[in-house]
Amino acid sequence: IESMYIVLISSSPYNTIVRQLRYIFNLEKNYSYADVDVLASNTFKYIEPISDDAIAKEIILEYANEISTNQENEVVIIIAHGPVSQADNVQELLIMNNIADYISNNSNFSEVRSFTLQDDAGKAIRDNNINNIRQYIKNSSMQGKRVLVVSNLMSGKGIQKNIEKDLNGLNYTFNSKGLLTHPKFKIWIEDSITK
């Protein structure tokens, strides 16, 4: 084997799991969880997470369009898993806001907003993020807007059930598909390998 490409199934580089794996592949000086053996070899080619790549933006816009009926009267919420630390969360939200800007500029949606759950952070942090999302949905509904929820989650069967439970009782439409299930994700991998 001349080259082995490592594709992390993560939508963002701003989390401790990605940092630990980067450490293992000798791309990060400090480990996140455990000081383990480092794989220092030119055979391994590490591909950065999809983040706000053009293909990620296109996929998420397609997922919003799939559940849209009248863009001018709809708001789109993009929900990310989110990291543990607040510093990483700031960086993650920059990525998410780039995606939101792309969707706004390539559609007629009334508004596009990004949120992170910080699903593995402390309960108080996660609860605060959920409350912010719920309040945004309530306010949008009171303004007569239809609320569409999409995500940059990788799979379609991860924390989506938790999101549905967290938003129970609110009026919204959720496209729970993940980036991995879209045919363009394979194109992104192929493009990343040839860069």
Write out the residue ranges for each language-model feature.
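Extended amphipathic ligand-handling, pore-lining, and cofactor/metal-binding catalytic surfaces
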Residues: 1-195
